[in-house]
Design a protein with these regions (language model features):
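Long, charged, low-complexity, helical-prone intrinsically disordered regions
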Residues: 1-402
């Protein structure tokens, strides 16, 4: 029997899988709440842009409400029992649960062979092994080090992007799994040997074959997405089309993923078992541009009729919506875009622009947006919300916030 879903059902299924089916406002968010949500999502994308807050903090706020960012810092970079995560290339630079470390070993082996990494870094790995071994020895002898501690470069210009040769060596060793990220100093990575960072039991686990690991990554992607096309599934952990299609066929044949038709989708989709679609889902949140609900832009357009592009690197005069625009999820639909900035020197959360989608934003949506903005400002330690944008919608929001 062929399964089919309406577009509205697919949206609710996707939102529930992504953690938008729970109670957002708790009296206190505890470590276990973060651990449970991270297990559902599978990973958090890391990005250096700090216009609002580092992107890896936002997805948990969107789903759980205000929480102590120290909890995530401890989970990601502490020493001891509170450490639950590690950094690696999942969906771009990512934080992943420690138990998923064995699932990435095949990718580390490929990186060591110059596969699946930037061409310039692969070339560096082929040409600069003596320097790479020197850098590894320095870390072995001195402990966790950042690129700044090793750099001998006197000038900014050089043949390897704008990185020092030592930074390239560290990045190559990280990609190859010979080093890992022990912590961060500010936003600078501190690299150390995996055996000095991770439990011995974790490193001693048997390695999976590439096929086994890729099947598990696709299973986890399907669980995190709820319903997804082959391209959606492979994008979650950045598998190649060849890797994804072969493993997907095996999972379907084994009955672990079920094909499903979604209204309006031209490509077949897949679910991890018989879909359990929530009858109603009224989730509302401001979303990071790097949130796993929207990071695959074609999927966001298919699910929500929401065409979304990040305009950070677009010249100001050519931007349509703004520099750092967060989609606004209201009652399970993406209804608006908010260009936000944390202006810490002025202790305010500034709305530089506000745009509604074609169906507009009614008073109830604006009141919910105002609550989201107040909550975010308090979470970031900012005293006020300031509406800098112009237009009728901004005027209405300003009135709601008064």
């Amino acid at each position: 029997m062929s399964l089919s879903l309406s577009l509205a059902e697919a949206r609710r299924l996707a939102l529930a899988a992504q953690g938008f089916d729970g109670r957002r406002t708790r009296r206190s968010v505890q470590r276990r709440h973060l651990r449970e949500m991270l297990a559902r999502l599978g990973l958090l994308q890391i990005d250096s842009v700090n216009a609002l807050v580092r992107s890896h903090y936002l997805p948990l706020f969107s789903r759980l409400g205000p929480y102590s960012m120290t909890l995530l810092d401890e989970a990601a970079w502490s020493v001891g029992r509170h450490r639950q995560l590690f950094e690696y290339w999942g969906h771009e630079a990512s934080l992943l649960p420690l138990e998923h470390y064995p699932l990435m070993r095949w990718r580390m082996h490929q990186a060591a062979d110059g596969q699946g990494i930037y061409q310039q870094l692969a070339r560096f790995g082929r040409e600069q092994q003596p320097l790479i071994r020197q850098v590894l020895q320095a870390v072995r002898e001195q402990g966790a080090l950042g690129a700044g501690s090793l750099s001998t470069r006197q000038e900014r210009a050089g043949p390897w992007w704008d990185w020092s040769a030592e930074k390239h060596a560290l990045e190559w060793l990280f990609a190859a799994g010979e080093l890992t990220v022990a912590g961060r100093r500010g936003f600078e990575r501190l690299y150390d040997l995996p055996e000095r960072v991770f439990p011995a039991e974790l490193l001693a686990r048997p390695e999976l074959s590439e096929a086994q690991a890729q099947r598990e990554l696709l299973r986890m992607a399907a669980s995190a997405l709820g319903v997804a096309t082959e391209k959606d599934l492979r994008d979650y952990y950045r598998l190649s089309p060849a890797q994804s299609r072969a493993r997907l066929a095996e999972l379907v044949e084994a009955g672990e993923l079920l094909p499903v038709r979604v209204e309006g989708w031209s490509q077949p989709a897949y679910c991890p078992g018989e879909p359990q679609v929530p009858r109603r889902l009224g989730a509302s949140a401001l979303l990071s541009p790097f949130d796993s609900l929207v990071w695959e832009r074609a999927r966001a357009e298919r699910l929500f009729d929401f065409r979304y592009r990040l305009e950070i690197y677009t010249p100001k005069e050519k931007r349509v919506y703004g520099y750092y625009v967060l989609p606004f999820l209201y009652n399970g639909r993406l209804v608006g875009r908010v260009d936000l900035r944390a202006e810490r020197a002025r202790e305010r959360l500034a709305v530089h622009a506000l745009h509604a989608e074609a169906n507009g934003m009614d008073d109830a949506a604006l009141h919910e947006l105002a609550e989201q903005l107040r909550s975010m400002a308090a979470w970031l330690g900012l005293a006020t919300v300031a509406i800098e944008g112009r237009g009728e919608l901004a005027v209405r929001l300003r009135g709601v916030l008064l």
